[in-house]
């Protein structure tokens, strides 16, 4: 597996650093605490994520209707609860895959002054 060094301090970046951020294209180095930016893979990842969200909503509606014919009580469960229970494992797996992909294939830059300059 390819290790990507921090452009500021030179220490290796990890997927945990990307996952701890709210936005996958901006995160902090765990060693020097400087904000890093990633430009190469963020836009395609976000487009795929939006498409996956739309697909999941459609599939959840189909699943709820199919389960509603077998168990009528499912029709009275709010769609948000149904979506959280079904989509949370998918979210966790995709978050880890995105972090791994950003670390391996991303173009990570630092906009501030380099250490020692």
From Swiss-Prot:
<keyword id="KW-1133">Transmembrane helix</keyword>
<dbReference type="GO" id="GO:0005886">
    <property type="term" value="C:plasma membrane"/>
</dbReference>
<feature type="transmembrane region" description="Helical">
    <location>
        <begin position="73"/>
        <end position="93"/>
    </location>
</feature>
<protein>
    <recommendedName>
        <fullName>Uncharacterized protein YcnL</fullName>
    </recommendedName>
</protein>
<keyword id="KW-1003">Cell membrane</keyword>
<keyword id="KW-0472">Membrane</keyword>
<feature type="transmembrane region" description="Helical">
    <location>
        <begin position="43"/>
        <end position="63"/>
    </location>
</feature>
<keyword id="KW-0812">Transmembrane</keyword>
């Amino acid at each position: 597996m390819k290790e990507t060094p921090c452009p500021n301090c030179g220490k290796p970046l990890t997927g945990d650093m990307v996952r701890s951020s709210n936005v996958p294209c901006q995160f902090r180095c765990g060693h020097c605490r400087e904000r890093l930016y990633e430009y190469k893979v963020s836009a395609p990842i976000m487009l795929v994520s939006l498409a996956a969200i739309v697909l999941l909503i459609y599939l959840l509606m189909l699943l709820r209707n199919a389960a509603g014919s077998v168990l009528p009580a499912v029709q009275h469960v709010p769609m948000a609860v149904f979506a959280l229970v079904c989509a949370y494992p998918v979210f966790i797996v995709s978050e880890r895959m995105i972090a791994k992909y950003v670390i391996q294939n991303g173009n990570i830059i630092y906009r501030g002054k380099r250490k020692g300059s």
